[in-house]
Amino acid sequence: MFEGFDLSKMNEMLGDLQKKAQQMENENANREFSVKSGAGMVEIKISGKGEVLDVSIDDSLMSDKDSLQILLISAINDAVKLIDNEKKNLAAKMLGDIGNLGGFGCEK
C-alpha cells in the first residue's frame, strides 16, 4: 500500500513550504497600504499586520465632528477589508503551492 512512499521527501517538502509561507507572511507584514475616504479628506496608512501607521485628516473636517466620524469609520472599515483580502490572497497563494507538491513524496 505504501510502496514507494518517501516520508523523508514529503517532510522536506512540507518544511520548504513552511519556510516559504513564513517568508510570504513576513513580506506582507512589511507592506504598507493606504485607504482614503471622503475624496481623500481622510487617509489611513496601515501595515500588512493590520497596524495603523498614520491618519491624515483634511483641516476642513476639524469643525465638522459628525462628518469626521463618518469618514474615519469608512476609512477604518476599508483598511480592515483591505488587510483581510490581502491575508486571503496570501492564503490562496500558499494553498496553490501546496497543490504543487505533486506525488507527495511517492515515487512512480
UniProtKB/Swiss-Prot annotation:
Intracellular or extracellular location(s): Cytoplasm, Nucleoid
First-listed, main subcellular location of the protein, grouped into a coarse class: cytoplasm
UniProt signal peptide: none
GO cellular component, one term: cytosol
Keywords, in A-Z order: Cytoplasm, DNA-binding
Record's keyword annotation contains DNA-binding: yes
Molecular functions (GO terms): DNA binding
InterPro entries assigned to the protein according to its UniProt record, in alphabetical order: YbaB-like_sf, YbaB/EbfC
Transmembrane found in the keyword field: no
Pfam families assigned: YbaB_DNA_bd
Family as reported in the entry's similarity comment: Belongs to the YbaB/EbfC family.
Function: Binds to DNA and alters its conformation. May be involved in regulation of gene expression, nucleoid organization and DNA protection.
Quaternary organization: Homodimer.
Protein's recorded name: Nucleoid-associated protein CHAB381_0200
Organism per entry: Campylobacter hominis (strain ATCC BAA-381 / DSM 21671 / CCUG 45161 / LMG 19568 / NCTC 13146 / CH001A)
